């Protein structure tokens, strides 16, 4: 009885190792994505996490949008905290400058909107130990630049603003405490900005641009929030140089895919990053909370929904990044913004390199990989061991021999057919990893059961090579022509698929030469002896498969036993000379062909049965880690954005594609699975599909958001209310509004380009009683008297002012 091999390419080891590997990797990815590192019991010198949490609770007691009393209270509290903090520090007033900016203002136009804004920013500048110039010096040296750290202290009118941007604000306060410790004194000047008015047109950052100190920094770190708790991700960056400093973070988190998605408009919101990079010309990065987006700009953006662990995750990243930038004494090049490729691995390791490097590696691999496989195929051919696409072999020549069938084509088209059908089903369902697995297994296992092939795994890997080659070409073009770095997984995936294929080609060098195998089969057939295999059952199975494959509607019923005299005579001559085997060439020696897998080609019996586990170990971990991270991030960041106006089709297609890439490494090995796992996944697919199609899509934890706008024409007094949201839902919401009960709804496509995927329903609204009708104010509530203004035009300077 043959000994059991725990690494053999059989059902037991395949199911065990693949299940364990995927389970371990997916659990690790989920834990990294959903859990937070604990804050330290002994934080760095100058950091007080208890005080940070107290500050966060104080500034988020009320909604505090710009131009509200609560906003004024928050500003007064922050200013008092800064002054109190500086009173207890040893750095003198010549090293720390507090700027209570009530002067800077901004006027700008965008489309049909003109904005005039008066800033109320708070700025603290910690002079660097290497900075010997005045902050207002217009001729500051390029090598004397500083670092800007920004957060905004205003909230939206519908939320407390704990993560948007309370955590960023308290992080800035702690950075001030950190850098004013003599041991932490930075080499470069650190400008700490608490701006007011980000939620409306990024006004606070635009007002900062008008202040002289805005010319001091040459890099920036922007702290933002678009969720409620969780990890703070390195959301986007301007170039490779500044991104490398984030690598020093204790718990790095993020991928360049988020930055590319932001550039392509997948997230319909902006941050102060836009002003600092595009208008001030600074190099820097965004560190932001990105989920759960359902709580973004809602009443649930509160301290109850976040934690001190979240505060520490953002603060620790800000400390590491800002410290690195402030210690960098190299001369900045404001004209050079080399795009970066960056991603983390399990929140522990941060990889960053230039997009140019990515392009060079892609081109190199696209050239080297095919040439290597072609070289290996040629070597196999020269060694007479290339069974790929080999239909038959001859003992002597094609003129006088009956062919010995090798069945090298068997299984070639299985993988692309199964892959295409399974992928189509996944895209059609817009969900379900289980659907792809179940359908692929049914097709590939069924084909293997009917026509077993030792080359099915190798052909599947070849198809993966072709597919990943095309994918890498696509992303290489995107990287070179459009500076899109999101395709970085394709480089690593193609490299692993290439190495797995190299192993498959090398494996064939251990197969017997085709001529030797043909001679052995010929000898066994003519001499009436059995092949020298370890199992007669395997031989009979292989012979049965051979007969089935040879038979056609034109095949003679006697062809299986037919012998010519010449053949019989040749067999006798061979039998007579059988004793001289030791003096004959390798192709004329008897071979121990080993035991092939049930029904597979007899020549495959001696191939090592453990190669598959090396191939799987190359394929699965890298692909699952890189693609799984992106899938989790995009799903959590984008699943709520259709209510913002994003196209659901693009999001569903992206998720389906990522789901397919995630399970594709199983494809070459899936035909060895028993029915138990696919059956379970199929039932899971059916159950979850029914639930997802029947269940109401929104809940308390996953709310539907709509845009509410009320317009009052100050000339005519016409008052219009509108709700903009998802078609089919916004009509029901608007119809239940009390003010709409007696009015007719007018639903149409919004004029705003970014909301074309939504519907806007309008009706005549209630008149807004800004001032009580019984009050003694002179202008009462007449809309025509709400605004009094005059416009002066200075012809001499061609300037206008309000």
Swiss-Prot record:
Chain sites annotated for binding Zn(2+) 1: 152, 164, 224
Comment on bound cofactor: Binds 2 Zn(2+) ions per subunit.
Membrane topology: Multi-pass membrane protein
Any one biological process term the GO annotation gives: proteolysis
CDD domains: M28_Fxna_like
Co-factor(s): Zn(2+)
Function description: May be involved in vacuolar sorting and osmoregulation.
Protein name: Vacuolar membrane protease
Organism of derivation: Leptosphaeria maculans (strain JN3 / isolate v23.1.3 / race Av1-4-5-6-7-8)
